[in-house]
Amino acid sequence: MAERNSASWNRKVASFCSEPKTFLCDSSVDGFLGELLKDLQSEAIHGQTKILMMDLLLEFPEFLCPDQKTVEMTAETLMNILKKMPSSERSMTLRCHLLLAIETVLITCESFNQNSKMAQDFASLLMHIISDVNDKKQGVANRPLRTTACECLRELESCYPGFLSQRMEKLYLMQQQEVTAAHQSYTLLYTVVLKNAIRFLAQKEGPSNGALKNALLSNEDFFWSATENMVELQPSSNEQLLLLPSNSETKDLKSILALLLEDSYLLTPVCQNTLFWQIVQVVAMARTISPVIFKSQLVRLFSTMDLSCFHSILQMKAVFTDSLFTGEDEHFLIQRLVGMTQHPLLSTPVKLFYLDCLLHFPENRPLTSNSEENLPVLLTVQMTSSLFPNVFNDHSTMLCRQNVLSMVYLENEGSYSEKGIAFLFEHVMSLYSMVHKNGNREITATFFRAVHLFVQYFNFCEKHMENLTEKLLKLYMSNSSLAPNFINLINQTQILLEFHVWPVTLSKALQKEIVNLPTDKWTMKNLGWHLKILSRVAQENSISQSSTALFLRRVVFCSDLCSKGDWRTGNALLSVCKHVLQHQKLSAIFVHLADLLQYLMHRFEDIDVQDRARLYYVLLTNVSSDKLGKILTMSPARGQTKSRSLSSIMTENENFSTMLTIRNAEKTLLCLQPVLEGIKAFTCISDSPSLYCIVLQFENTDCRFESISDINVPCLFVDRKPPVVTINLVPKEPYPTIFSVSATYSTQDGITYQTKLDPLYITFREMFIPLPLPALWPLESRFDLFGKLWSAFKPDEQNQFEESIFCYEMSNNSLHDIVLDNFSKFAVSCNGGEYKIAVFLPPQFHILMHIKSQDDTACFSVRTDNWNLLPYLNSHLLDITLQ
């Protein structure tokens, strides 16, 4: 196959990244991977394009390397490419990506072990690359490759802890000798190796007995077996691994750590954070080393403006607490956090991070051991006086500040706290004013979240809660479309305040406002929102539903609601009725509810609403209230196949409308498979349930074919042979195409699902059919027809006819096999190594081929009445000749 150019590979990579599985359905994994590896060695492909091609190995190694044999072959090919590349600055980026690709393939596909020759060669290659300290051998141009090799080794050490623990002396010497910009990578590599080595020794518990010294001075082969039984050290874990080195070992280790800390200022802030965290874990395990070793660094870190460095302080404090930080240090850090949360030069996400640090501050002596939000004991009301939220803050800052201040005022008493609570209530009211004046969606959501926070912390303040309830009622009456927000507020506060009456008080107040509304146009316009509120209120057994039943009766009797027959409104009415039917005090409203249901079942102009009203009426008049509540709240037993009883249909989460709802299937249970030439079938996954009323739907992705009608299959059972379905294709143009396929089906529990199937690919070869000739035509007549068509298809400027020649090196026997396998049905004559092939492509086009072999070269002479077919034919001939 001819090599693809760079533009073609760019399109190929984009197509693969968008849908890897779909892409590989059209071409074999081995073929595509082989083509990719081959073109990586081609000089015709640009370097940037090769990097894009290797991105496929970095992002999708599990797709391209499904087995160990493929992994080894891929890694070996990439290694050979790397070794053949010149050590030039121009090829440096590509060489770095080759290292990353090899490592990714080996690690991701679980092939990096001592049984893999490529793994051993790759690890040795990385060590060889980083041994060129200070660019003495390869020069400055090779420095990016050394840096990448260091990062690769660090990744290997992170994935396989202890892998480099027997090379520590060499790594330490290289780290000390390196004085170029690559020093940072060498330092991080050595620090990770040191931490893992000490953690490995600490697992044995007790004194090290010289093992630590031996590890620090080791310079042997890779430690392949060190990847087992390793645990992660948490910042505040009470089950840390401990190592007790001897005095001489402690001195050596302390000297190494001190040198690493002295070099920390040479690193970038992010790398400093990584370095500090590794050393923190080392000191936490080696108990003979005091955390005071970090004191000299704290002086510099306390004044930092960098987020990563400040995070290092918090990590140290979480691990070492008062063994490193005094009370004054803790007070200073809290003041610093408060100041940083409002620093004008910091971005909003950074300030929110500092606010979150306040809520999870690692105290020296915390009052509680839980990991939830808790304020530091040293954080006072006066310290947070500048954190009051205002409407000019962004919404996240506004809510976070309100949360912090609410906790401060809740834990403190006195006049400051009372004033603070009043200020917070004023802030909530300022948000209310913005929402009341038609605030946008974001302001509305912020207001309700602010209300939730205020109720969470200050529900005991009766005066503020009464004022809040009044404002909420006023807001709802002015904007009833906020009903979902009110329902969510009631639900969440009821969960939060299980035994508090405020959610019920708000519900009762909303009910009172709604039922007193007149049945005018404004009320009818917002009736849907009112019914949602009443449906939620009806779920409270402590609230009488007499006024609700009378309001519904008045709305139905005094309006044209029934004559309009709106299905959605009717079901909203019946949803309220369903919850009223479950109310404990049903006898008080029996007559009103019965009149309402009877009126709906006779007058409402929608058959579904009538049937549902009739069901409720029958239940109301024939079943006791105790049984009625159980029936309407009944759910099917777990594992029960037939779950669609009338009672389950009418529950809140499985109401009548869900029977008409088509759900998206969580996983695909069906797939199309070709079972015979020209025929497609679909099969069922072995552990799938029985499916019924299956409808296959096909959607054109272009205009090349007529639409395919839906195909209906009555049922599909796991233990039976899958049915065969025939798909009738009517092409408008004889070009390859793709049909999007979906299936709608029902399961045994009565639920209807829709799922997308793999696309149906129609290839160019599948459109070939023999010339539509009578079956009894003699061969001579067919031969004469071919000759006349060949002459008729001679191209000129007046038609779309075209001729072309395709040549490929092959023997006579190979050519005969290709014709026999691919064109036997279309052959007009086969005489003396010459073949004449005639192909008809619906709706009205033809391809004629005169094939012969000369000097071990097959020559395909082609004529067609549609020149647009030639590129597709050329690709097809390339495919069959390569096979």
UniProtKB/Swiss-Prot annotation:
Which Gene3D superfamilies does this entry report, sorted A to Z?
Leucine-rich Repeat Variant (1.25.10.10)
Q: Which domain of life is it from?
A: Eukaryota
Could you state one GO cellular component term attached to this entry?
A: AP-type membrane coat adaptor complex
Any one Pfam family here would be AP5B1_barrel
Q: How does it assemble?
A: Probably part of the adaptor protein complex 5 (AP-5).
Say what the protein does: As part of AP-5, a probable fifth adaptor protein complex, it may be involved in endosomal transport.
Name of the molecule in the record: AP-5 complex subunit beta-1
Q: What is the species listed in this Swiss-Prot or TrEMBL entry?
A: Xenopus tropicalis
- Lineage, highest ranks first: Eukaryota, Metazoa, Chordata, Craniata, Vertebrata
